[in-house]
Structure formats: structure tokens, C-alpha cells
Amino acid sequence: MRKQRIVIKISGACLKQNDSSIIDFIKINDLAEQIEKISKKYIVSIVLGGGNIWRGSIAKELDMDRNLADNMGMMATIINGLALENALNHLNVNTIVLSAIKCDKLVHESSANNIKKAIEKEQVMIFVAGTGFPYFTTDSCAAIRAAETESSIILMGKNGVDGVYDSDPKINPNAQFYEHITFNMALTQNLKVMDATALALCQENNINLLVFNIDKPNAIVDVLEKKNKYTIVSK
């Protein structure tokens, strides 16, 4: 029976414990253990952010060119990808890091052929360097990788938030939680699920989103087993 294909979008912030750390290897190892468990049932693709190492807000403070800043962000995701690959290798998980920019000594090219081979081998795919182009978000990258791998779901791991609300629950204690919303609702009400380009790509390719709190213990495993609170975004 063909395994269901899923993409998990993990922000760089999820990989750090506090402001003084860059990569928290306890968190990396915990994520790896969860991925190892679900890889027995799913073809798993991971899209990593790099915000634990480099953030666009820093570039603005330094009055840095946007192209350069975004390229630095892409390089940051490669570092994160190698750290996660190492943790998965220790668990004997068949893993490949696929990069949108050339870095042949460290990672493989994110090409259609390499993706096809990885799926055939049932490898966990770690996608790094975003789309390879500036001005595109990690959200857009997740949507593109989901389309390329023919994944049916993107798991959107949020830091400290259980899903989608009508306003920020950290600010508004009376914020309304949504169990299910449509792509059109997310766009028209600006519900901050992911950027508009990424939402449109998901809608066009029938890729559902599952928005959940990745900071909870065993969050990825539990949300796939429907044990945790989450929001579904679909047509």
C-alpha cells in the first residue's frame, strides 16, 4: 500500500530553546525521534526555516540589501538541515538533504530526479535553502515542495499556538479558535496561516493544511493521530 506523503514546515525558532542558543540539540533530537516514528507510515518531507540563525529583522536594522539578507537566510537553513540529518542518521533513518542552491560537498540538489529517487527509496527528505530565490518565504517553499512531492497535507508547526484564531490568542484571551477554515476565508480575513502566494498554491493543488502547536510534547506524532488540537485549512 502506498504511503501517504506529507510535508512538515518547521520554523527556525522551533530549533532554539532561548535567545542565547542558536541550535538546541535536545529539540533537534526530539524532532528526529518523532520523524523516525512517523516515517514508518508516511513519506515525510521537512521544510526548515533559518530564523534561529538569521532573521530578516536584523537585516533591516543593518540596512542590508534584501537579496543578500535572503541569501544568508537560505544558508542558515542548510546548517539546520545538516543538524537534523545528523540526528536522524543516529536513529538509522534513511535521510537526504535537498538544497535549492548548489552546495555539492554537503547536500544534494533539489531536482525533480532526486526527489523522485528519494520517494522511491522512502527517504525522509529535508528541503533547505528555500526556493533558491530571494523574496520568497518558507511558506511558499513548503507549498512548492508539497506540490513537487505530490503530498496531500502540509503540517504547519506554530510556536505556542494551537491552530488558527480570529485574532492573536497571546494578546486577546477571547480570541475565537477555528477547527476548520477554507483557503478563501484565510485569505479574505487575513488569518495569518501562511502568506497569500503559498495559500493560493495549496488551494490550486488541493493540498490541505494542518495547523498545530509544535511546542507540545510529541506534537507531530499526536497531531497525525488526531490526539492534539489543530485547525484544518482546505477548500
From Swiss-Prot:
Catalyzed chemical reaction(s): UMP + ATP = UDP + ADP
pH dependence: Optimum pH is 6.8.
Name of the molecule in the record: Uridylate kinase
HAMAP family xrefs: PyrH_B
Function of the molecule: Catalyzes the reversible phosphorylation of UMP to UDP, with ATP as the most efficient phosphate donor. Is also able to phosphorylate dUMP.
GO biological process: 'de novo' CTP biosynthetic process; UDP biosynthetic process
Subunit text: Homohexamer; trimer of dimers.
GO cellular component: cytoplasm
